[in-house]
Amino acid sequence: MAANQSADQLVGILRETVVALVRRDGPDLSARQLGVFLTCYLQEGAHTVRGLAADLNVSKPAITRALDRLGELDLARRKVDPMDRRSVLVQRTPRGSAFLRDLRGIMTEASGGGKKAARRAAA
């Protein structure tokens, strides 16, 4: 947790972020889908269905369903691992990278680091 932000402030940022995502005309992701997406994009290294299931402590079918939705939205894609054809790799996409940039912007705004902060300073 950031040293200068209380738990209440962080929950407020989360709420504002979720509300902004709900209001916008963009991908509508469940909490699990968002968790899988963020794990793939924020943790370095190759990701597999098996590894994501272990990291998130959910079943492989749950990861597969989340990846089905992320794939429909072109936020992630799956590819058979050429080194081990039993394993499926999860890959990032340009659209997923753009979504992550947007998400970071929304969170910056919600935390007061964006236009809101500039408006408050000008007032």
Specify the residue positions occupied by each region the protein language model found.
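N-terminal helix-turn-helix DNA-binding core of bacterial DNA-binding proteins
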Residues: 19-58
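N-terminal leader segment of winged-helix/HTH proteins
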Residues: 1-27, 123
